[in-house]
Amino acid sequence: MALNLEKKQEIIKAFATKANDTGSCEVQVALLNERIKLLTEHLKTNPKDHSSRLGLLKLVAQRRNLLKYIKRTDHVRYVVLIEKLGIKDR
């Protein structure tokens, strides 16, 4: 499941730390979070789509690793990000 360009630009603008910032951890986590939401909805309607389920698991692992990195380097940034995204703290 791909994000459309407008939605992607909106997410980048909301989570960018400076102008033209597309690669910061916050932006990456926000984009992954949106893709995870889309795939979750897809899997609710198509429960036998195993390749999408594996892709979802990979995206969740990637998001978890990025969040772990942010938590380790700057805890305040981590707390703000998970509150903005509505992700539970583990």
UniProtKB/Swiss-Prot annotation:
Residue ranges of the TM segments: none
Keyword Hydrolase annotated: no
Keywords: Ribonucleoprotein, Ribosomal protein, RNA-binding, rRNA-binding
Superkingdom in the source lineage: Bacteria
CDD domains: Ribosomal_S15p_S13e
SMART domains reported in the protein's UniProt record: Ribosomal_S15
UniProt GO cellular component terms: cytosolic small ribosomal subunit
One Gene Ontology biological process: translation
Presence of keyword Ribonucleoprotein: yes
Pfam families hit by this protein: Ribosomal_S15
Any one Gene Ontology molecular-function term assigned to this protein's record: rRNA binding
Subunit field text: Part of the 30S ribosomal subunit. Forms a bridge to the 50S subunit in the 70S ribosome, contacting the 23S rRNA.
Protein's job: One of the primary rRNA binding proteins, it binds directly to 16S rRNA where it helps nucleate assembly of the platform of the 30S subunit by binding and bridging several RNA helices of the 16S rRNA. Forms an intersubunit bridge (bridge B4) with the 23S rRNA of the 50S subunit in the ribosome.
Family under the similarity heading: Belongs to the universal ribosomal protein uS15 family.
Name of the featured protein: Small ribosomal subunit protein uS15
Organism encoding this protein: Helicobacter pylori (strain J99 / ATCC 700824) (Campylobacter pylori J99)
Gene name in the database record: rpsO
